[in-house]
């Protein structure tokens, strides 16, 4: 009887109440990664949505980008982190670690064994049992502060180690006030010379003894500054189970502002703060309600949505007068207004920012305001910011992020400054960080492409992305009512993808300064003319004009054959450009999807291109394959780098049944819905209801607001008015639906004649 009832209940749909969405989040998803193979390269970010400060249990050595790995056996401390990626690494770091017995500062010696069986990680609360010390450590964050609690055994030798890290730090112990203050300067680049992360710590117990530490040596006195300083605060614990609490906050502006930020904690205790954090997370995640039978699918979905609302990070603070202010990571001054950071637009322009525009537009309006401030403070929009300009990746995709926001209806920020910024960035390169602006713009503007043989790497990738970015600027300018004289160059350059298409191979190919194509040419060679991919991946990076690409290839049939080949080719590769097999290659190889590389961004949209070529059922098949096979709510849950929300946002959109192939069009290309029911609660009070009936992945029939719908795309403007979308799914493809010319989504060639 029990068994029958159990399986009957399991077969019923699990309805997620919007108040409880956070309970499905698995922060450890993607954390079982290393240098050679990424299953996410994530860490459990204990934080608020878009929070200024994140917290992480630190298992890696100081300075190691892999600061938490699932396979690790020991924890070195509870660390404040601002790391967006292990490849970018961290800044503004310090940690607290409880120890018992001999006061030990060295991170190797103080590290304690732990088990995932005695670890609890949620977005708003973390706890772990530190076995070597019989101590339970707890943490609950706000946006800029945190409350920690350390439950000790009965002992006269309980300690909390405060590590300000190396590369320049300062600490001051104030025993009479139960306080410790300091700053850290450790960073990984992208900061002015005066960069500091000021931190303040306030305990609820009297100090029994204190030690200051400088460069590995215990010092007399309560104040130290040097390469690597810290403090050890000692307590007497009268009974087992007694808790020592620490209120912690930080500021990039000054110590006084850090004390201002600690007021976020108020007088709340751990339970109250956790409830506040839980409520906040449910407000954000609950914007999307999901109903389905498979609880692991729900866990995966909400874990991906959690990752989609962490970055970009808020880099602003509120002063004592209630004003929004920020330390500028570009010029080192304190300015009024918003600032956000820790995102790479090469990754996130694709669908992370479109997700914000659909579900959280008020957040992106602040981000856009911050982008205008970035331009004012540095002369360029960022392409990879952490916290300032970083030399990473290619493209000028800030143009996409800015244009898509405005074209999606976002307002209330300095649009004219952003127009000036995108035009400037299209015709200049940052004097010190050549990944900001356009490296090779002189060649591109003159020839229509970046040549392969002028010592500018990844030239085809740059050309393709610049062409799309020019289209974005053109669309943005049209919406602003700019003159044809201003717009004409961008419209013309939007076709520059044609300049690097090789008719002989049917693929994009490096082109020399003299106009000839590179030779020899191996379309399976990663890097070289491309960025973290090969010609089979990058040929499809004509987001704004798939019909134009189709014509270059010779029509729909050839286009479909070439797209089929991506999945049919074995996962062979040439890694000679790098001299070793980079992790992105290995991730493609082991996933058994041919040469499709979902673990990296360049081809993540490619699955949806069948909707342009009259074979949408193939998109439906491959989308479902990726979602079923390449995402799980486990420590190895991704198939490559999660990348600041991009790979997660792909899952979120794809679960809805549509995806923004070309940000800036206002269209979503249809795939197949993943859940039986979804409700999207928009900020304007409207609601999008998505229903799916039937088994299988193929869309047999679709209705929009009660009317039969044949097209392979949805318009954002229609959805934002509120919509009812229903799908009837089948185990067999419907090869008649969505096959007409009029069913295809937007392509620039069709609108620029």
Which positions does each model-derived feature cover?
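Accessory carbohydrate-recognition regions in carbohydrate-active enzymes
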Residues: 14-353, 357-400, 406-464, 472, ...
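Extracellular glycan-interaction patches encoded by glycine-rich segments
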Residues: 690
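ATP-dependent phospho-/nucleotidyl transfer catalytic cores
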Residues: 469
């Amino acid at each position: 009887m029990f068994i029958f009832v159990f399986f009957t209940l399991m077969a019923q749909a699990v309805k997620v109440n919007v108040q409880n969405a956070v309970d499905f989040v698995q922060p450890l998803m993607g954390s079982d990664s290393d240098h050679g193979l990424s299953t996410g390269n994530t860490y459990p970010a204990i934080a608020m949505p878009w929070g200024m400060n994140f917290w992480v249990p630190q298992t890696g050595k100081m300075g190691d980008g892999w600061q938490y790995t699932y396979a690790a056996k020991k924890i070195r401390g509870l660390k404040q982190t601002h790391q967006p990626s292990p490849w970018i690494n961290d800044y503004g770091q310090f940690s607290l670690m409880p120890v018992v017995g001999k006061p030990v500062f060295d991170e190797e010696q103080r590290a304690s064994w732990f088990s995932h069986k005695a670890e609890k990680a949620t977005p708003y609360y973390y706890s772990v049992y530190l076995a070597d010390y019989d101590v339970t450590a707890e943490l609950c964050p706000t946006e800029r502060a945190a409350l920690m609690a350390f439950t000790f055994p009965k002992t006269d030798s309980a300690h909390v180690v405060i590590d300000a890290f190396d590369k320049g730090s300062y600490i001051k112990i104030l025993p009479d006030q139960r306080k410790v203050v300091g700053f850290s300067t450790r960073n990984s680049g992208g900061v002015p010379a005066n960069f500091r992360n000021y931190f303040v710590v306030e305990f609820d117990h009297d100090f029994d003894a204190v030690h200051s530490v400088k460069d590995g040596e215990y010092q007399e006195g309560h104040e130290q500054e040097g390469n690597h300083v810290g403090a050890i605060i000692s307590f007497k614990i009268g009974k087992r189970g007694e808790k020592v609490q620490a209120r912690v906050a930080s500021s990039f502006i000054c110590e006084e502002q850090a004390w201002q930020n600690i007021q976020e904690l108020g007088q709340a205790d751990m339970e109250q703060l956790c409830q506040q954090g839980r409520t906040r997370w449910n407000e954000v995640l609950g914007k999307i309600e999901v109903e389905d039978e498979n609880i692991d699918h729900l866990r995966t979905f909400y874990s991906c949505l959690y990752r989609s609302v962490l970055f970009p990070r808020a880099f602003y603070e509120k002063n004592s007068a209630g004003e929004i202010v920020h330390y500028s990571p570009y010029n080192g001054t304190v300015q009024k207004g918003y600032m956000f950071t820790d995102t790479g637009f090469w990754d996130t322009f694709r669908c992370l920012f479109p997700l914000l525009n659909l579900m959280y537009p008020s957040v992106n309006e602040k981000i856009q305001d911050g982008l205008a401030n970035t331009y004012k403070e540095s002369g360029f929009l960022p392409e990879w910011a952490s916290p300032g300009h970083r030399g990473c990746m290619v493209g000028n995709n800030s143009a996409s992020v800015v244009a898509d926001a405005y074209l999606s209806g976002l307002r209330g920020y300095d649009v004219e400054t952003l127009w000036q910024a995108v035009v400037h960035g299209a015709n200049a390169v940052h004097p010190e960080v050549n990944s900001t602006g356009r490296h090779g713009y002189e060649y591109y503007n003159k020839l229509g492409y970046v040549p392969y043989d002028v010592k500018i790497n990844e030239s085809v990738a740059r050309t393709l992305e610049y062409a799309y970015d020019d289209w974005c600027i053109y669309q943005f300018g049209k919406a602003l009512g700019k003159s044809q004289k201003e717009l004409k160059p961008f419209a013309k350059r939007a076709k520059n993808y044609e300049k690097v298409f090789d008719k002989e191979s049917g693929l994009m190919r490096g082109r020399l300064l003299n106009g000839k194509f590179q030779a020899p040419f191996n379309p399976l060679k990663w890097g070289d003319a491309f960025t973290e991919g090969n010609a089979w991946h990058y040929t499809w990076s004509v987001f704004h004009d798939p019909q134009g690409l189709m014509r270059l290839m010779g029509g729909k049939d050839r286009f479909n054959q070439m797209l089929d080949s991506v999945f049919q080719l074995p996962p062979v590769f040439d890694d000679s450009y790098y001299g070793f097999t980079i992790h992105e290659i290995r991730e493609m190889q082991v996933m058994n999807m041919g040469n499709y590389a979902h673990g990296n961004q360049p081809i993540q949209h490619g699955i949806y291109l069948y909707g342009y070529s009259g074979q949408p059922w193939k998109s439906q098949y491959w989308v479902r394959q990726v979602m079923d096979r390449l995402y799980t709510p486990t420590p190895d849950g991704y198939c490559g780098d999660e990348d600041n929300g991009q790979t997660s946002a792909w899952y979120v959109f794809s679960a809805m049944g549509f995806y923004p192939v070309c940000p800036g069009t206002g269209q979503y290309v249809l795939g197949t819905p993943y859940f039986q029911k979804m409700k999207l609660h928009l900020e304007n009070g409207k609601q999008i209801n998505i229903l799916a009936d039937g088994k299988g992945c193929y869309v047999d029939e679709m209705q929009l607001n009660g009317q039969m719908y044949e097209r392979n795309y949805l318009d954002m403007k229609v959805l934002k008015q509120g919509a009812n979308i229903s799908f009837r799914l089948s185990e067999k493809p419907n090869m008649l639906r969505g096959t007409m010319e009029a069913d295809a989504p937007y392509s620039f060639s069709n609108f620029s004649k």
